[in-house]
Amino acid sequence: MDNLNELVKECGVELYDTEIANENGRAIYRIYITKNGGVSLDDCEKVSRLLSPIFDVEPPISGDYNLEVSSPGLERKLSEARHFKASLGELVKAQTAEAKFAGRLVKADDESIALENDEGVFEIKIGDIKKAKTYLEW
């Protein structure tokens, strides 16, 4: 669905990411949304009520599925430059083909990020990152 961003914006939130998962043999189409000040249950409900009838006519995936709408959570996947920019100052784990890094995200632009930990500051090109997510230290 090409206009998913625009549809979600009608509800006063931003599209963060989508995901297709399989849990207990059931397909789940997840839509993650964000907004300044945090996402409420009402926000999720608005998006779900807007998209459900549209997806009944133009399904986002083939076959039977459940639609879930939620915030990306405190420990969330980072895959786009905008995700990293919005996570400045947070703890991030990133994996490239060569190494794994963990530290505080101290820089993020369209091309690269920088993670700082006790060993120093590590600059990583976003295109080299295979997997990244925020994490909490308890």
UniProtKB/Swiss-Prot annotation:
Any single biological process term in GO: translation
Gene3D superfamilies hit by this protein: RimP-like superfamily, N-terminal (3.30.300.70)
GO cellular component: cytosol
Keyword Cytoplasm set for record: yes
Localization annotation: Cytoplasm
Chief place where the protein resides: cytoplasm
UniProt xrefs under InterPro entries: Ribosome_maturation_RimP (IPR003728), RimP_C (IPR028998), RimP_C_sf (IPR036847), RimP_N (IPR028989), RimP_N_sf (IPR035956)
Top-level taxon in the UniProt lineage: Bacteria
Extent of the signal sequence: none
Keywords tagged on the record: Cytoplasm, Ribosome biogenesis
Entry similarity comment: Belongs to the RimP family.
Biological role stated in the UniProt entry: Required for maturation of 30S ribosomal subunits.
NCBIfam families registered for this protein in UniProt: PRK14639.1
Name recorded for this polypeptide: Ribosome maturation factor RimP
Protein species of origin: Campylobacter curvus (strain 525.92)
